Amino acid sequence: MDKLRSPYHDTMRIAGEVAERNAWAAKASDFSNDYSLWQQVGQTNQKGKFDDIVNLFHNRFETIQEIFRTQAGFKASGSIKQIFREKGRNKDYNIVGIVLDARRTKSGGKMVTLEDRTGTITVFVRKDDPACATIMTDEVIGVSGRFDKSGGEMFWVNRVVYPDILTSNQNKGGGDFDPVSIAFASDIHMGSKEFLEAEWDKMIEWMNSADETAQNIKWFVLSGDVVDGIGIYPGHENNLTITNSFEQYEMCARKLDELPDHITPVILPGNHDAVRPAEPQPMLEPAVQEKFNSAIHVGNPARITLSGIDVLSYHGKGIDDIVPRVENVSYEHPEEAMKLMLKKRHLAPMWGERNALSPEEEDQMVIRTPPDLFVTGHTHAHTVEWHRGIPLVVSSTFQGETDFMNMLGYKPKKGFL
């Protein structure tokens, strides 16, 4: 039994940092499968026209501006047009805008062009401002500062403000949740030659054991890429044992059927799954869902309440745009990107870069309210961190190193739960 438990027992959940182990000795089978899905994403009638993109950014701006006002305690002094009209040399102004452009200066600071519906303004952010290194185009930020003393139009920023999570705004499930556990994994990649089938089967065997931690698991959240897919990258077929995506899902369904009755899997798609690549991604199509007997299928991202815990689950493709543009964020430490997502209140701020986005009528990548827990996958890393009291879980992979990963320098932390 100890050999069976050892790979998973201590990494099973963050509850060890939240409550004593004895408080989590309840059996999950004694509690109902209560869940609620906040919003179903990716169901769109948009055509991807220019006006659709404009409307998306209008919605993004208005939504995050409201978050600034109601949750972050920061209110704009007016529109950019109003501020220009009323500007004074010795008066402080608060501005909220979308970052149209951000460029480094010779001094190390940034010249940032902000935009709202009424116009644009160029502001200067000093290099010693902690936010200087993290400003990204297309995100919504707030700045506080003054116009140049000479009476010009240059705006000097005293501080950059993000619509970050306030401690007083944390939900914490309202204290009304069942004493059961949620297990997390991601990037299983069934159908790949590097799928760690032996490790996966050992985990399922442990989940079926009498171990009290295993008996306490109610939900098993799989944050995307449950299969390896086909044609994802050049030469992909050479790394597959199953070259038909439907057969890959059939294998996944068979494996999940081996879960004990008290554990319900929750499946969202990732960039290897058989859905559109642009985020937000819809849930797997009905023909695929039919292969699974008891799984809950959601889109990507998903905001789902499980036994009273508000979980934000996101595959994590937006990390691909943050890593090359923000210092101290890497694929080895994706939790730093997750912290920025919460600070910025957006899962994928940049438009049209490595991560494709769909111009929905409503920007479904905005984090409108603080979750109780935030989980991602995609990077094949594994860690647990915290931001403003919110647990951040980077789900581990069940895929070993592929030639493509070696080319990219990926070093997966595999086989953790």
Task: Map each language-model feature to its residues.
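Extended recognition/assembly regions associated with phosphoester-bond processing machinery
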Residues: 1-417
